[in-house]
């Protein structure tokens, strides 16, 4: 694949700013020229919609901003707007996501290309405004394509790509782009913003889909009896499964257009790795550092980051982990009562088993409620695994057990 020259890259980049992931999401929504934004502020997502409201007020974007009274209303408004042909955007977190939950299925069932940013946050109770991925993991079965970013630049780029993916005729599904609450949503990082004309050339508005139009009346969202419900739902499943090819195509086109390469997964030192840490989100930098620390101790360690959660890129994951002896899955969410407690660990274990790969899978829960996890913690779990110090298939890193004071 031909790479952009330095001069070509410089001509594409409009500005280099220090941005939080919240603001990176807002700039992406501005640059793709969204038509309708409906949102209700909730920590730690609030700065995203505040910044978009500022863009609208300043005339930087010609869009309708709807300050609704709840997240349920926000998604309802976007469903109506998207059904009428508008390009739409919202953002939320935690209880806000749960409040719009019934609408998530409606958005995917109606095949509406809505894009939503999620600043991930712990689920109440107890009330906790800090970050983990319990909210994000709760929507895996709603029919939304799901991307988890690990940097503010990736948030910006992923939202731009999300519109191309969602609006593709082969897909027509809503997309959620998630990132760590506070650890990313409120942390300033360098971000390159692209000139609007390049972004809008990459994301042309595609109205080649059925919309509510009084000049061409259609019925949308009608009741489906058993004779047809199954087939309609199967179309959503079919679109989701086939979207992985579209996502790959758009990744390659984005690289050709902007000089940034993304995949379904990201690997680190996997060539000869026997002990592999699998994770997602903003902890990726600490995981890589922990792997380097383990390598200095002679442990053949590596790491894999899952960027695309839905559709689940099982083939890429299996290829990446085919030589691993132990796979430690770091989950910042929990599925109580499941076969293994980590939502991602359950998916990884299933993918490996179906392909006959006999690696040991350890579900390692970490950082619930944003409990801090350091690179040394990753190193310690790798060292313990290497020396057969982990006997259980599930571990909780850094938790004070009941009765321990």
Predicted feature descriptions by range:
Residues 53-58, 249, 289-303, 353-354:
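Short helix-loop-beta junction
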Residues 48-51, 77-79, 100-104, 125-131, ...:
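Short acidic, glycine/serine/threonine-rich loops at helix termini
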Residues 1-138, 143-144, 160, 180, ...:
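Thiamine diphosphate
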Residues 332-405:
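Peripheral docking tails and interdomain loops at the edges
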Residues 130-174, 178-181, 358-371:
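Conserved thiamine diphosphate
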Residues 299-326, 333:
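Core nucleotide-handling region used for phosphoryl-transfer chemistry
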Residues 264-299, 312-319:
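Redox- and metal-dependent alpha/beta enzyme cores, enriched for Fe-S-associated oxidoreductases
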Residues 174-266:
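Conformationally flexible catalytic loops at phosphate/diphosphate-handling active centers
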């Amino acid at each position: 694949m031909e790479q952009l020259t330095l001069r070509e890259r410089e001509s594409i980049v409009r500005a280099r700013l220090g941005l939080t992931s919240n603001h990176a999401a807002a700039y992406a929504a501005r640059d793709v020229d969204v038509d309708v934004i409906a949102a209700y502020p909730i920590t730690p997502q609030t700065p995203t919609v505040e910044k978009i409201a500022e863009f609208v007020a300043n005339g930087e974007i010609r869009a309708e901003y709807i300050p609704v009274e709840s997240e349920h209303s926000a998604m309802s408004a976007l469903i109506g707007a998207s059904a009428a042909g508008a390009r739409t955007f919202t953002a939320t977190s935690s209880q806000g996501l749960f409040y719009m939950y019934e609408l998530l299925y409606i958005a995917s069932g109606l095949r509406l290309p809505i894009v939503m940013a999620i600043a991930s946050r712990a689920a109440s109770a107890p009330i906790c405004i800090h970050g983990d991925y319990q909210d994000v993991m709760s929507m895996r079965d709603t029919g939304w394509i799901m991307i988890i970013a690990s940097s503010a630049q990736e948030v910006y780029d992923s939202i731009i790509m999300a519109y191309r993916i969602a609006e593709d005729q082969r897909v027509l599904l809503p997309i959620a782009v998630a990132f760590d609450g506070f650890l990313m949503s409120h942390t300033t990082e360098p971000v390159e913003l692209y000139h609007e004309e390049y972004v809008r050339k990459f994301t042309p508005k595609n109205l080649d889909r059925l919309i509510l139009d009084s000049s061409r009346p259609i019925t949308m969202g009608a009741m489906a009896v058993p004779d047809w419900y199954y087939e309609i739902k199967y179309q959503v499943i079919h679109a989701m499964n086939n979207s992985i090819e579209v996502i790959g195509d758009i990744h390659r086109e984005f690289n050709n257009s902007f000089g940034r390469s993304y995949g379904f997964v990201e690997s680190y030192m996997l060539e000869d790795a026997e002990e592999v840490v699998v994770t997602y989100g903003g902890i990726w930098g600490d995981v890589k550092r922990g792997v380097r620390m383990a390598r200095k101790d002679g442990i053949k360690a590596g790491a894999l980051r899952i960027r695309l959660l839905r559709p689940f890129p099982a083939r890429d994951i299996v290829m990446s982990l085919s030589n691993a002896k132990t796979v430690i899955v770091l989950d910042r969410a929990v599925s109580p009562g499941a076969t293994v407690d980590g939502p991602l660990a359950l998916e990884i274990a299933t993918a490996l088993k179906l392909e006959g790969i006999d690696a040991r899978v350890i579900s390692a829960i970490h950082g619930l409620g944003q409990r801090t996890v350091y690179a040394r913690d990753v190193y310690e779990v790798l060292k313990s695994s290497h020396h057969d110090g982990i006997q259980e298939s599930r571990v909780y890193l850094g938790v004070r057990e009941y009765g321990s004071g």
